[in-house]
Amino acid sequence: MKIYHYTSIENLALILKHKTIRFSRLDQVDDVEEATYGSGPYNTLLGQYAFVSCWTKEEKENLALWNMYTKYKGIRIGLDEDMFITYPINPNFKTFFNSYIKFENDYFISSINNEAKLIDVNYVTSPEDYIKDIVKEENNMINISPKNIGIYKRKEWDCQKESRFRLIIFPVNPKYVEIIQKRKLDDFSLLTQAMGAFCQSLKESYKISLLYKDMPIKKEALDNIEIMLGPNTSEGERAIVEALLTSFPNHIIKYSYFKGKIRIK
């Protein structure tokens, strides 16, 4: 099944060049409110640990998305839903990452918290009600159930009909764990040494340095890419898109139904 992403021609060029899709940190996306919801006894701001790539399943054109993300001059990308390179943990669970756990400078990524699947956004009256109890403290340890992070938006955003791929990337402030300052922790046996730092970092809403993460996609997904040109796209811009797609022989390019039907003011 194809899913769709409204964006600029420049972003299309970057996707094709690097063969990756960018996941942006939730406090960097258009809905500012999403990243402001606190959770648990320390009011932890979980939005800064969720990274999302935003799509829609709606094949029918969405004028709101054309306007919000392209000002009617960009493109709509259509790619297969299973576009990403993934790694099976079991027959029913694929992840974006090929190691159980990986530490970087001030964060860690766990494969079991990062299922490679498209998640429908839920549009609700009070998103904060679904976030406030994700983080709990028991016996001086932080427990967190991340499944609700980054999937609730206020109902006024319903026009987007959004679905997301999501990464959960947790904080580890290096000042609490000397060993992380010296080398990467890719060995699962070292995980317990970082748990105290993880709990303290969550309590403080420590903001990790990472703003985005680019995830690799399959060559065959790009080989079958569909591009729709925006309602106000010029012939010159079409020529640029055609040049970008010369290496992908099965591509499809078509114009928006609304070309010539919108008076841009």
Predicted feature locations:
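Catalytic-core loop-and-flanking beta/alpha module that positions acidic residues
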Residues: M1-K265
